[in-house]
């Protein structure tokens, strides 16, 4: 699953009709600069995914897209690490939470930036060993930040400090 039109086209996959939700355990979170550790229970490939993180600022339930920005405290960088082979192992029963929920698989930071009125002007860039590996404008997202906050808030209550990785 991905949340960008250009990447969907590049990979030759269908545009999703709705976003994929999954919850990460608090033990997966680490701060910027901490080391992502491959678990002993997994011997496959570990991949990075640079993503925009939306930080919720106040309790949020059933808000519209227009109201969503009033519930966003700010934005952060997110490295949504994945044990990719766990998802691919059985396509009929993908292990999303396990593949993304290992200890240290949720890196955020180094800070939270508030006061961004139009997140569509942001660009997600991932640089690994001085090489740019990802470069996607938020405006190319299938489900943009305000839409994601609205959609998720209609399914579950969002609390202050919750982080939505945008995919």
Residue ranges of predicted features:
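Catalytic-pocket segment enriched in acidic/His residues
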Residues: 7, 37, 84-167
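A generic structural signal for short beta-strands and their flanking turns/coil linkers
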Residues: 16-18, 25, 48-52, 71-75, ...
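A residue-level signal for conserved active-site and pocket-lining positions in enzyme catalytic cores
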Residues: 1, 54, 80, 108, ...
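Short acidic/polar capping segments at secondary-structure boundaries
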Residues: 3-4, 26-29, 51, 58-62, ...
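Conserved hydrophobic/aromatic beta-strand scaffold that supports enzyme active sites
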Residues: 21, 28, 53-55, 107-111, ...
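Solvent-exposed alpha-helices and their adjacent loops that cap or buttress functional pockets
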Residues: 13-15, 21, 43-48, 65-70, ...
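Extended, compositionally biased flexible segments
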Residues: 1-50
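Non-heme Fe(II) oxygenase catalytic core, chiefly the N-lobe of the double-stranded beta-helix
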Residues: 33-68, 73, 77-82
């Amino acid at each position: 699953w991905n949340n960008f039109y250009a990447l969907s086209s590049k990979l030759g996959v269908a545009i999703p009709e709705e976003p994929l939700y999954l919850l990460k355990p608090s033990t997966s979170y680490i701060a910027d600069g901490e080391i992502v550790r491959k678990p002993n229970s997994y011997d496959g490939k570990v991949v990075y995914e640079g993503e925009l993180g939306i930080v919720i600022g106040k309790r949020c339930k059933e808000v519209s897209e227009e109201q969503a920005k009033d519930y966003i405290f700010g934005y952060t960088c997110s490295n949504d690490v994945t044990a990719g082979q766990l998802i691919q192992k059985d396509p009929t029963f993908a292990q999303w939470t396990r593949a993304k929920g290992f200890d240290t698989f949720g890196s955020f930071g180094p800070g939270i930036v508030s006061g961004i009125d139009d997140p569509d002007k942001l660009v997600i860039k991932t640089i690994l060993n001085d090489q740019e590996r990802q470069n996607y404008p938020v405006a190319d997202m299938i489900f943009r930040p305000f839409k994601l906050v609205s959609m998720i808030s209609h399914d579950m209550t969002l609390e202050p400090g919750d982080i939505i990785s945008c995919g």
